Amino acid sequence: VHEPVRGYGQACLRGLSALSAADIVVFLDGDYSDFPEEMPTLYEPIETGAADLVIGSRVLGQREKGALLPQARFGNWLSTCLIRWLFDVSFTDLGPFRAIDYTALKQLKMCDRDFGWTVEMQVKAARLRLRCMEGPVRYRKRIGTSKISGTVSGSMRAGYKILWTIFRHMG
């Protein structure tokens, strides 16, 4: 599937539009940072009926030195604390490697077209009281430079967007 318009959420929406049917959808980055062989950690709790959404937590798993930059670690901490406080659902990460039941995903009516996609999914799942859990995943340095966490301005834009997304879905 090719998506000419930039944006993480846009790419995810394009991929979803190409699906004809699915039971479980797994999302992961294509920049070499995730380990695809760890997918069972994420989809098996959904297959067994234990969860609707499973986030691959880079915080709970092993990370290559320098793979999760300080600004990303701080942003994760702040965002997950806010989600816990506002929605009473505990996460340690907003990481992109995740699995979700397809029926649950459709209920979320995802619409964010850029880097608010992951937090939008988690906040909407929390509001709908979906069964959410995390599984530890390994994380390595990506290939190339991130447009988000690789620059100060990108990190600030991402932080603003993530916080805005959390507060937008409060009420």
What are these regions (language model features)?
Residues 2, 30, 137-139:
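Short glycine-centered, acidic/aromatic-flanked micro-motifs in structured strand/loop junctions
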Residues 3-6, 10-19, 24, 36-115, ...:
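Acceptor/aglycone-binding surface of glycosyltransferases and processive sugar-polymer synthases
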Residues 32-34:
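Acidic metal-phosphate-binding loop of nucleotide-sugar-dependent transferases
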Residues 89, 113, 123-140:
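Catalytic donor-sugar/metal-binding loop of nucleotide-sugar-dependent glycosyltransferases
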Residues 120:
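Cell-envelope/extracellular polymer assembly enzymes that use nucleotide-activated donors
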